[in-house]
Structures are given as structure tokens and as C-alpha cells.
């Protein structure tokens, strides 16, 4: 169906815009090249199916990019995708149909003809994605790099790796989306060096979304299966909302609200490549069956950035009205900078965390390694010596009305702090009893 799809786009372009309509049925193809002022509409019952490459045909080759050393292959190329656009404006993809990346892959993505993303957009503006579904999307369901004025509304994603990667984008609205991504992050904001220059991801709202780590395909078909216990990084399922890891640029003015996490990792805010992460507000979050730290804030020094880039900053963060049930206690919540680079001005309030518990007083004597240059995940620290929050290399942290519950007794202290100043605890309870912060 590739030739017919190309003709449809050419006709729309010749008329200075219009709608390319996919009626009910399957349309197997390789790369679809978007154009400005085009509305791609996928009707109910229509499926755009990514074909498997053959010896003579395949997806568009990855374009040259001299700035690949600071991020992986997937973040550095856009054309090797099922649907892609570069330097475009006024684009809409909508409709109740399905984009099925059947022939896409995360593996062997450097080979000629191989496609590794469902939708890729670079340096575009005024883009709307709404109402369709994405299944089995290779490395990314959506990679949007340097896209300004991006709206993603009521999109369902069920894939094996990342769902939405929002990289170096400005003015982004993500709402009423369902993203299942057991082997990678569901909704992730990034600020890579893929464009060849520093650019922040800023002015982003994520609201009324559901993210999870159920088995691939089992959310779209509503079977909610749990038979794939481990992601490729050996960290169990993923499926979370995250800022980072790519963070050469920064993250500014981000609001996340009214979201549900289920059978996945917890909320992660990470800047480890020199970016500034600041002015973040997160509220009304509920989590269930969380496999690592419910709240993970990390300022590190991996430094996948041009030489001379200084360590980043993390400050002015508000997290409130969070409920977490059945969280793995090995990795309690973590707020950790590094020596000489402190996380600052964080307030956590109106939080309930229900942990599994079961660890010992001896576990409370452990000292986690610094791991300044390591890829940030909670398990890089080993078992956490605190059963509530581990707080290190910070300044001006407030915990107010934070309530902890434990299914099994846990002998570790509730809070462990190191190189921490101006820490305030207010209205803290453990299993319904007031916690004396003087102890």
C-alpha cells in the first residue's frame, strides 16, 4: 500500500493541504512522510501496519547526525520510522483507528531498511495527535524533538519500549492518555543534545493520564496480564512518568496532575547531564503495585554533554496529594544530589505511602554508594537504609502531612539524612501514630 499512500499525500500537498483519509481495513507500508498542513485521519477499523523489511524494501534510512555521541541511536535519528516529519507545521493525526508497528524493532535498528519508531517529529510546530491507538512501536511510540505547540489528547499506547518521548519541546499538552510500557518509560520528558545544541523542555502539562507496566498488548485488549516480570535493564517492569534521563538541556515549568500509576516504577525526576530541573508541580497522583522508589529525585553527574558542561541543578519542586499502595520497600523514596551539587527547595505534602515492609535494623545501617556517574535508578544504591525517605546532599526540604503504613514490621529508621540542611518534618505518622521527629 506504500505507493497509494504516497500518492494520497502528494495530492494533498498539491492542494496546499487537506486530509489523507484511511478507511476501515489494513494498510501495510514502510515510512510515511508527513507534510505541512495535512490531517492524517484513521477511521474506526483502519490499521496502518508497519511492514517487515525485505531484502529490497524497507523504511527510510536514518539520516546523518554529527551529534550522536551524547545520546543513543534512537534519539539521534527520525527518518527511520513508520511515520515521520521534519521542519513541518500544522499537522494533525487523529481518528479512532490503530497504528500497529508490527515490523518495527528496538533491536538491530542500525541496519538498512529497519524502522525503530512509530511516529517521529523533529523541529515541527503546531502539532495535534488525538484519539488513535498505538501498538508495538519499536523503540518509541512517539519521539518528538524540538516540537513546539504539541497537543496529545486521548491517545492509547501499548508498546514494548518508550511510549511518549518529549525531547527539547516547548508548550506541550498531554491529557487523557493511556500508556502501557512494561519495558521502558511510559511518558518521559527529555532534553537531549540530539539537535546539536542545548534546548530545554518547558511549559509542559501532563494530566488525567494512566501509565502502567502490564504485559505488551494486554491493556489495549483489556486482559491486564502480568507474565513479563522483568525489563531489559533487570529492574522489573517500568511504565512510569519520568523527567530524564537525557538532560543536557533543562526542564522548566512542568505540571503533572490527576494521573494513575499501576504495576510500574514510581515517579522519577532526574537531571544527570548538566541540565537545570526547576519549577515543577506534581499533584493528585495515585500509584498501586510500585516496584521501586515511589518518589525518586536524582541530581547526578553522568554528563553525556559537550566537554565543559557544568553539573546541573534541581530546585523549586512541589509534590502533593499522592497516594501509593503496595510499594516495594527495598527502595523507599529517595531525594539525592551529589557532593557539591545539592537538591534544593523541595516540598512534599499530603502524601500516603503503603509499603510492604519486612526489612531489618541491620538494613538501616547500610550506607549507599554515591554512584555520581551511574545511570540513575533506585537500585544503584542497593537496599535503602530508610523505610520512608533517604535524603542526601540537599538543602531546604519540607515534608508536611506525610503518612507511612507498613504491611510487615520494618526495623529501619523512617528517615535517613546525610549532608542535609534545613529539613522540616511536620505532621508525620507511621501506621496511624504520630512520629516523633526528635528521635
Feature roles, as predicted:
Residues 1-439:
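Extracellular/periplasmic carbohydrate-active domains that bind, remodel
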Amino acid at each position: 500500500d506504500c505507493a497509494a499512500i504516497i500518492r494520497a499525500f502528494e495530492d494533498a500537498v498539491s492542494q496546499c493541504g487537506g486530509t489523507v483519509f484511511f478507511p476501515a481495513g489494513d494498510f501495510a507500508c514502510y515510512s510515511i512522510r508527513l507534510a505541512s498542513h495535512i490531517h492524517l485521519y484513521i477511521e474506526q477499523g483502519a490499521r496502518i501496519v508497519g511492514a517487515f523489511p525485505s531484502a529490497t524494501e524497507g523504511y527510510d534510512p536514518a539520516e546523518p547526525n554529527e551529534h550522536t555521541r551524547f545520546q543513543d541511536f534512537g534519539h539521534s535519528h527520525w527518518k527511520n520510522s513508520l511515520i515521520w516529519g521534519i521542519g513541518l507545521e500544522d499537522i494533525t493525526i487523529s481518528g479512532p483507528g490503530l497504528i500497529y508497528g508490527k515490523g518495527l524493532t528496538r533491536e538491530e535498528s542500525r541496519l538498512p531498511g529497519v524502522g525503530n519508531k512509530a511516529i517521529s517529529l523533529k523541529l515541527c510546530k503546531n502539532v495535534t495527535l488525538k484519539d488513535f491507538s498505538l501498538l508495538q512501536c519499536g523503540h518509541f511510540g512517539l519521539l518528538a524533538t524540538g516540537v513546539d505547540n504539541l497537543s496529545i489528547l486521548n491517545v492509547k499506547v501499548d508498546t514494548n519500549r518508550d511510549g511518549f518521548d518529549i525531547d527539547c519541546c516547548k508548550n506541550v499538552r498531554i491529557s487523557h492518555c493511556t500508556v502501557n510500557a512494561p519495558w521502558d518509560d511510559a511518558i518521559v520528558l527529555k532534553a537531549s543534545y540530539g539537535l546539536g545544541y542545548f534546548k530545554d523542555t518547558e511549559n509542559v502539562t501532563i494530566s488525567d493520564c494512566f501509565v502502567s507496566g502490564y504485559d505488551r498488548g494486554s491493556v489495549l485488549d483489556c486482559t491486564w496480564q502480568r507474565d513479563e516480570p522483568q525489563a531489559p535493564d533487570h529492574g522489573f517492569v517500568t511504565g512510569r512518568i519520568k523527567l530524564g534521563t537525557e538532560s543536557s538541556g533543562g526542564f522548566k515549568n512542568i505540571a503533572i496532575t490527576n494521573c494513575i500509576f499501576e504495576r510500574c516504577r514510581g515517579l522519577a525526576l532526574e537531571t544527570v547531564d548538566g541540565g537545570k530541573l526547576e519549577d515543577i508541580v506534581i499533584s493528585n497522583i495515585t500509584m498501586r503495585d510500585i516496584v521501586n522508589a515511589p518518589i525518586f529525585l536524582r541530581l547526578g553527574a553522568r554528563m553525556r554533554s559537550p566537554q565543559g558542561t557544568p553539573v546541573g541543578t534541581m530546585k523549586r519542586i512541589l509534590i502533593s496529594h499522592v497516594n501509593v499502595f503496595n510499594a516495594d520497600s527495598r527502595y523507599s523514596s529517595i531525594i539525592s544530589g551529589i557532593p557539591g551539587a545539592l537538591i534544593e527547595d523541595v516540598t512534599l505534602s499530603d502524601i500516603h505511602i503503603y509499603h510492604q515492609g519486612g526489612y531489618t535494623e541491620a538494613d538501616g545501617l547500610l550506607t549507599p554508594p554515591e554512584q555520581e556517574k551511574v545511570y540513575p535508578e533506585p537500585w544503584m544504591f542497593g537496599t535503602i537504609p530508610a523505610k520512608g525517605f533517604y535524603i542526601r546532599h540537599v538543602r531546604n526540604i519540607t515534608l508536611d502531612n506525610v503518612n507511612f503504613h507498613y504491611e510487615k514490621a520494618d526495623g529501619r529508621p523512617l528517615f535517613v539524612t546525610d549532608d542535609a540542611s534545613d529539613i522540616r518534618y511536620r505532621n508525620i505518622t507511621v501506621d496511624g501514630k504520630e512520629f516523633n521527629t526528635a528521635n
